[in-house]
């Protein structure tokens, strides 16, 4: 009888242990968010914030207002309202790089999906500090930090062995930019720019920049007409 009891207990215990291991080893479900156009993005936790791990592709604001698609250089540089485009006016760049937006689109405060927003300068600084940047450097402009840019860059796609580690999960791709002064497209593979929602002045919007030949992160103000990429951050609860 004792032998039977012991065998019965073992038969109960072993499946229980396997179940516990399965539960403890189960990966967390990925975080996703869907925009007004139905594009779904992966997101990641960086520090205490949840960031999109991809560039925004939306062609409408979250109230369903259309954003104007502008291929023309002359129209782009005369902007006084929200514009967007694809790099080199090639829609095949949408899937990988997302859309380039001027700062007028950012300032609508409706560019990101509901419950998300374009990160402020302070929120970008919080990201950078979570990767080891000092407060003094985070508060500065120009090239700042040590290897935070490398941690933000993707592992592929950067020129001349300039790939990052993507240790942050930000996965910054080298998507280039659209210049606000002539409307031209430049430097895909070498640089990428992201708007913040914060203005440096009435005519300049603050942004972040990553370069193939830099491990730091660049912060400065730029013409509001410039075409830069956008990430979204989840609203705090």
Sequence positions of predicted segments:
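Polybasic, lysine/arginine-rich low-complexity segments
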Residues: 2, 26-27
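Bacterial N-terminal signal peptides that target proteins for export
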Residues: 2-13
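C-terminal motif of bacterial Sec signal peptides marking the signal peptidase cleavage site
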Residues: 21-24
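Conserved positions within compact, well-structured domain cores
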Residues: 27-237
């Amino acid at each position: 009888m004792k032998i039977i009891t012991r065998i019965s207990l073992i038969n109960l215990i072993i499946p229980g242990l396997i179940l516990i291991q399965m539960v403890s080893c189960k990966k967390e479900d990925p975080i996703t968010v869907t925009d007004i156009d139905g594009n779904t993005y992966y997101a990641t936790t960086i520090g205490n914030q949840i960031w999109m791990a991809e560039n925004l592709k939306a062609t409408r604001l979250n109230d369903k207002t259309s954003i104007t698609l502008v291929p023309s250089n002359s129209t782009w540089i005369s902007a006084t309202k929200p514009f967007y485009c694809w790099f080199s006016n090639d829609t095949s760049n949408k899937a990988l790089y997302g859309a380039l937006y001027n700062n007028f689109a950012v300032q609508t405060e409706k560019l990101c999906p509901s419950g998300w927003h374009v990160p402020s300068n302070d929120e970008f600084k919080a990201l950078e500090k979570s990767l080891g940047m000092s407060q003094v450097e985070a508060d500065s402009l120009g090239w700042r930090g040590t290897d935070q840019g490398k941690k933000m860059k993707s592992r592929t796609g950067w020129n001349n062995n300039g790939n990052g580690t993507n240790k942050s999960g930000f996965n910054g791709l080298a998507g280039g930019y659209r210049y606000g002064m002539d409307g031209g497209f430049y430097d895909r593979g070498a640089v990428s720019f992201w708007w913040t929602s914060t203005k440096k002045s009435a005519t300049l919007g603050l942004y972040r920049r990553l370069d193939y030949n830099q491990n730091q992160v660049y912060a400065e103000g730029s013409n509001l007409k410039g075409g830069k990429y956008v990430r979204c951050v989840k609203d705090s609860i």
